Amino acid sequence: MAQVPASGKLLVDPRYSTNDQEESILQDIITRFPNVVLMKQTAQLRAMMTIIRDKETPKEEFVFYADRLIRLLIEEALNELPFEKKEVTTPLDVSYHGVSFYSKICGVSIVRAGESMESGLRAVCRGCRIGKILIQRDETTAEPKLIYEKLPADIRDRWVMLLDPMCATAGSVCKAIEVLLRLGVKEERIIFVNILAAPQGIERVFKEYPKVRMVTAAVDICLNSRYYIVPGIGDFGDRYFGTM
């Protein structure tokens, strides 16, 4: 059995894979890219992934379970932030030695699909500032092109949760990271949070930006000829916002 940190037995849907195939992919990713944090593969997580992968799932149900999953992802990503020791006094006048967040954080969503993750971040980080980056493919060069950015003025002093539910070719996320670095954000302070990734996308992210951290719920097998993740979810933004 592949030993994946912080995970239990890897449950595999036999419709698209075998245990050995999926575990081999996950083991390879974890071994080669130590900055990838894979969520613990519990039955609850796999059940939610099954619902949002199902093409027959109606929009309302898709959004409900996607939101649940996103919140769990954000909670997992918060573990990657630095903490400092803090002592408080309980209502029983007894000291408790705990911790508190050490640094300011903000979210940055890659428009449009990344906006689906904003409410999950706000739900667990009250008052968290959120910026946006819009990236589209240049029809002439086929390369990602920055169209729009609206980010906190002090973003260089913050840890950044970069939000995009899918990591296929990683063109958009790499462009977004480029923008953040240009604005003074430290590479090691960027945490890329996504639901589903392809091995090709992960490899590109860490080839270009090895100090970034990535938190994901699942890693799939590959990309198809249209650069969709397989077995995948489909177009997450279209399904979430009902624009299919």
UniProtKB/Swiss-Prot annotation:
Positions annotated to bind 5-phospho-alpha-D-ribose 1-diphosphate: R112, R137, D164, P165, M166, C167, A168, T169, A170, G171, S172, D235
Known function: Catalyzes the conversion of uracil and 5-phospho-alpha-D-ribose 1-diphosphate (PRPP) to UMP and diphosphate.
Enzyme class at the top of the EC tree: transferase
Domain of life (superkingdom): Eukaryota
Subunit structure: Monomer. Forms homodimers in presence of substrates and homotetramers in the presence of GTP.
Source species: Toxoplasma gondii
GO MF, one example: uracil phosphoribosyltransferase activity
GO biological process: UMP salvage
Protein's name in the database: Uracil phosphoribosyltransferase
SUPFAM superfamilies in the cross-refs: PRTase-like
Catalytic reactions on record: UMP + diphosphate = 5-phospho-alpha-D-ribose 1-diphosphate + uracil
Pathway: Pyrimidine metabolism; UMP biosynthesis via salvage pathway; UMP from uracil: step 1/1
GTP-binding as UniProt keyword: yes
Binding positions (uracil): I229, G234, D235, F236
Essential cofactor(s): Mg(2+)
Activity regulation details: Allosterically activated by GTP. Binding of GTP leads to 5-time activation of the enzyme.
Annotated residues for binding of GTP: K59, R68, Y102, S103, K104, I105, R129, R158
Keywords for this protein: Allosteric enzyme, Glycosyltransferase, GTP-binding, Nucleotide-binding, Transferase
Family: Belongs to the UPRTase family.
One Pfam family here: UPRTase
Keyword match Iron: no
EC number: 2.4.2.9
Family annotation (CDD domains): PRTases_typeI (cd06223)
UniProt remark on cofactor binding: Binds 1 Mg(2+) ion per subunit. The magnesium is bound as Mg-PRPP.
InterPro entries: PRibTrfase_dom, PRTase-like
